């Protein structure tokens, strides 16, 4: 059965992660999210307090990114950022893995890094960003298996910051690996309704995009990385 606009909207994390995002742009992001009933807005952690105020009593969650976009910070730093973002009003956390550790064969360190943030989140859902454009298929599977074992809420394809975005093949691989219990978030390059529906068909359950309004309106999306 085709998805209605309302159902499609509830798969969307309406996203603005640009380093120069102004307060006015964050307010507009939140206004759009409330109007279209998106699942959440996804913002940098410094913008969580403003977004939380703007979305109070709307039912739209605030999602904060952690260790973004490189994932190369200390685990303790990522955990602190997650804790602080949640205290400021974030209802979901998207973290970037330690990609360098994975490439160096330090899988235990990668898993410990994810676990540290997962513990800091408590009951708040954690999404783990793989940055699939930098990984081999074997590495993608390895991280998805870690996330499945740790019981995080979602695995997520990409940051959308210059290393390639979501692909149907990656979404399908991630879904096969984590099975039916974890969410899969496709992010990076999902800019129109056809792309959104294709990602959902491939196994995604959430979409990270700056083109949410265009997607639910069936228009051409914007040109940002998200």
UniProtKB/Swiss-Prot annotation:
Belongs to the DeoC/FbaB aldolase family. DeoC type 1 subfamily. Its EC number is 4.1.2.4. One of its GO terms (cellular component) is cytoplasm. It catalyses: 2-deoxy-D-ribose 5-phosphate = D-glyceraldehyde 3-phosphate + acetaldehyde. One of its GO terms (molecular function) is deoxyribose-phosphate aldolase activity. One of its GO terms (biological process) is carbohydrate catabolic process. The gene is deoC. InterPro entries: Aldolase_TIM, DeoC, DeoC/FbaB/LacD_aldolase, DeoC_typeI. It is found in: Cytoplasm. CDD domains: DeoC. Pfam families: DeoC. SUPFAM superfamilies: Aldolase. Gene3D superfamilies: Aldolase class I (3.20.20.70). It comes from the Bacteria. Keywords: Cytoplasm, Lyase, Schiff base. This is Deoxyribose-phosphate aldolase. Pathway: Carbohydrate degradation; 2-deoxy-D-ribose 1-phosphate degradation; D-glyceraldehyde 3-phosphate and acetaldehyde from 2-deoxy-alpha-D-ribose 1-phosphate: step 2/2. Disulfide bonds: none annotated. Catalyzes a reversible aldol reaction between acetaldehyde and D-glyceraldehyde 3-phosphate to generate 2-deoxy-D-ribose 5-phosphate. The active site is at 94 (proton donor/acceptor), 156 (schiff-base intermediate with acetaldehyde), 185 (proton donor/acceptor).
């Amino acid at each position: 059965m085709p998805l209605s606009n309302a159902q499609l909207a509830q798969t969307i994390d309406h996203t603005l992660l640009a380093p120069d995002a102004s307060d006015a742009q964050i307010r507009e992001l939140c206004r759009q999210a409330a109007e279209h009933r998106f699942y959440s807005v996804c913002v940098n952690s410094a913008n969580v307090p403003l977004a939380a105020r703007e979305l109070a009593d709307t039912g739209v969650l605030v999602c904060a990114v952690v260790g973004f976009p490189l994932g190369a910070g200390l685990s303790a730093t990522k955990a602190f950022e997650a804790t602080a973002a949640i205290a400021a009003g974030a209802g979901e956390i998207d973290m970037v893995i330690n990609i360098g550790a994975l490439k160096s064969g330090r899988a235990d360190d990668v898993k410990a890094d994810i676990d540290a943030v997962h513990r800091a989140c408590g009951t708040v859902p954690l999404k783990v960003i793989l940055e699939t454009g930098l990984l081999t298929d074997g590495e993608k599977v390895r991280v998805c298996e870690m996330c499945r074992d740790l019981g995080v809420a979602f695995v997520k394809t990409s940051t959308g910051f210059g290393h390639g975005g979501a692909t149907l093949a990656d979404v399908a691989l991630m879904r096969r690996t984590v099975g039916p219990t974890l969410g899969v978030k496709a992010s990076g390059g999902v800019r129109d309704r056809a792309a959104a529906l294709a990602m959902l068909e491939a196994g995604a359950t959430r979409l990270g995009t700056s083109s949410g309004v265009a997607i639910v309106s069936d228009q051409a999306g914007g040109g940002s990385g998200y």
